[in-house]
Amino acid sequence: MTGFGARLVEATSRRGQLCLGIDPHPELLRAWDLPTTADGLAAFCDICVEAFSGFAIVKPQVAFFEAYGAAGFAVLEYTIAALRSVGVLVLADAKRGDIGSTMAAYAAAWAGNSPLAADAVTASPYLGFGSLRPLLEVAAAHDRGVFVLASTSNLEGATVQRATFDGRIVAQLIVDQAAFVNREMNRSFHRSEPGCLGYVGVVVGATVFGAPDVSALGGPVLVPGVGAQGGHPEALGGLGGAAPGQLLPAVSRAVLRAGPGVSELRAAGEQMRDAVAYLAAV
């Protein structure tokens, strides 16, 4: 399997920059006339898999699956496999973060050979970026990606992420540490091709004030908060000094509200994909 960065570049060049979310919130299940049970969850995901099969990358929100216990995790495993079987990259939005052997166990689950392992996973660095080392090592060994939370769109996040340490805000420190990992990986494999993305990305909310500088990251930037959370697709160009093709806008509710019809859901996704298509060149 080729590295995650290369797979992402190939997928987005053919299928666009948009990352679609699968967020099976109970309110959405009810709006789709589905029961708020594991069976309803499975039906919701089946519709999403069919509608999103032509897109580059899809992001299931793990918490909404966890809420149904073992049955929910079974649906998540099936959904990850179904999406990947039709050529869609899967980003598991699990936001895992811990230390030592516990982090190593999370790494095995989400970036190793577990049925839950996707193409990439989100992670929290707020026990120290170094605490992510087990996850980063396992992801690299299995050609998977890691998106590290840097500057999130929730207001509470700023109390930590905009604090200053070593002359930089914490969000910038996280980006810089992710950039270091990508540089080391490229050096190890003698990669220097223009447009080549590393396997460590960061998460920067679409609505944050003063986004960190991602120009030296060398990896993708996931940009949640577009649509229902107030981020405007047309306002993302050059966010944080990003290069063309580096930003990956993430949209969930703004598209999912078009369901449950597969054609309507697909059309809503395509409309949003068209709205962010300019990011491939800006």
UniProtKB/Swiss-Prot annotation:
InterPro entries: Aldolase_TIM, OMPdecase_AS, OMPdecase_type-2, OMPdeCOase_dom, RibuloseP-bd_barrel. Its EC number is 4.1.1.23. The keyword Lyase applies. It comes from the Bacteria. It catalyses: orotidine 5'-phosphate + H(+) = UMP + CO2. SMART domains: OMPdecase (SM00934). Pathway: Pyrimidine metabolism; UMP biosynthesis via de novo pathway; UMP from orotate: step 2/2. This is Orotidine 5'-phosphate decarboxylase. It comes from Mycobacterium leprae (strain TN).
